[in-house]
């Protein structure tokens, strides 16, 4: 998908063109194609890793020991031969395809024409823009450059100590010196806002799922499946509901970053030693007291890993969101990747990397300190 930024042919370039022209039916078909390819390769690699060796009696013929390999090769050769005589087996042309892009477009338009859908999407768009995105964006852009650097340095010192604070100061000073500070702040705004909202929605969901083994397994399965999907796939439903707006970008990143938040929160809560929760029960603690005073504090190092991954995913997703048009570093990178402005490309890339590394180092340092404090 990323190669579509530099004009490489393939499904990525086709998807980019369809999304920019708002042809959601064809976009959905291309997206499903990429997802199926990704899921197939993912499941194949997992099956290969967990496959146990088979043992046969001495003297078993080679073809019996490798029966499925022989069967697969025979099937491959059979279709290679027969495809020379039946053209549709050689390649399914676009005229013979089972495309339902127009029908899907019709279904989407019909769904969006329901009054309750219009009212809901309009309210969400209005609420996010008026009460979340615009105020926080203006506030961040209003703060002077060195005010932001000082704030980041202070946050890094509070969570990680002197080394993360020094690294944060150096990295954000470099970002300021590179000349794309306003776009960097828009990128930071989208990232932090999305991750904050992903925790706001993801934490209650994870806490609920962590209560039982069955719910935990089901939620982890959903997270595994969601992580298999290419990142851009989350843009499609957001575009369908909210059009090409800043709200679309925030909601797509929110859904994408909820996966590590939910996964690591569940793992952290389920990983609390049973004897500690039993001690809390014996002391007469209520469910909420046990959660806030025992389980969450002990799970925080693992939850911090989820926060770290969510931030990294969000910075990555902001760049992907340039497919539908943004005003941040991703948009500038999309404009220059297909050209010969290598210096500008490196400058923009380093700006994103330095911001991401700042938070990565600070969060990891805090998680390590927390583990030592808890004796984990």
What kind of region is each of these model predictions?
Residues 1-3, 25, 29, 34, ...:
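Transmembrane alpha-helices
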Residues 2-5, 36-40, 174, 196-200, ...:
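Hydrophobic transmembrane alpha-helices
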Residues 11-48, 235, 329-367:
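Hydrophobic alpha-helical transmembrane segments of polytopic membrane proteins
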Residues 43-189, 363-376:
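N-terminal, non-cleaved signal-anchor transmembrane helix
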């Amino acid at each position: 998908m990323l190669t579509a930024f530099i004009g490489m042919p393939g499904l990525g370039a086709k998807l980019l063109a369809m999304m920019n022209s708002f042809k959601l039916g064809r976009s959905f078909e291309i997206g499903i194609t990429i997802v199926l390819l990704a899921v197939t390769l993912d499941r194949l690699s997992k099956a290969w890793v967990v496959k146990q060796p088979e043992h046969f009696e001495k003297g078993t013929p080679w073809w019996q020991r490798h029966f499925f390999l022989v069967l697969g090769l025979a099937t491959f050769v059979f279709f290679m031969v027969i495809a020379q005589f039946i053209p549709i087996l050689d390649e399914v042309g676009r005229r013979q395809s089972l495309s339902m892009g127009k029908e899907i477009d019709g279904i989407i338009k019909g769904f969006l024409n329901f009054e309750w859908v219009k009212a809901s999407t309009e309210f969400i768009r209005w609420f996010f823009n008026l009460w979340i995105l615009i105020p926080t964006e203006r506030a961040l852009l209003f703060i002077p450059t060195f005010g932001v650097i000082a704030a980041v340095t202070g946050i890094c010192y509070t969570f990680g100590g002197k080394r993360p604070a020094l690294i944060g100061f150096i990295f954000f000073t470099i970002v300021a010196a590179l000349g794309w500070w306003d776009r960097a702040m828009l990128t930071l705004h989208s990232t932090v806002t999305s991750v904050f909202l992903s925790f706001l929605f993801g934490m209650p969901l994870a806490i609920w799922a962590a209560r039982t083994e069955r719910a935990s397994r089901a939620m982890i399965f959903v997270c595994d499946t969601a992580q298999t999907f290419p990142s851009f796939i989350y843009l499609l439903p957001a575009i369908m509901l909210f059009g090409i707006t800043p709200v679309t970008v925030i909601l797509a990143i929110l859904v994408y970053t909820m996966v590590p938040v939910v996964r690591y929160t569940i793992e952290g809560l389920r990983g609390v030693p049973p004897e500690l929760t039993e001690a809390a029960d014996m002391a007469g603690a209520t469910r909420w007291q046990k959660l806030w005073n025992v389980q969450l504090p002990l799970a925080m190092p693992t939850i911090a890993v989820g926060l770290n991954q969510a931030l990294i995913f969000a910075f990555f997703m902001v760049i992907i969101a340039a497919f539908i048009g943004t005003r941040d570093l991703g948009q500038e990178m999309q404009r220059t990747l297909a050209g010969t402005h290598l210096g500008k490309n490196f400058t923009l890339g380093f700006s994103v990397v330095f911001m991401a590394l700042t938070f990565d180092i600070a969060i990891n340092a805090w998680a390590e300190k927390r583990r030592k404090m808890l004796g984990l």
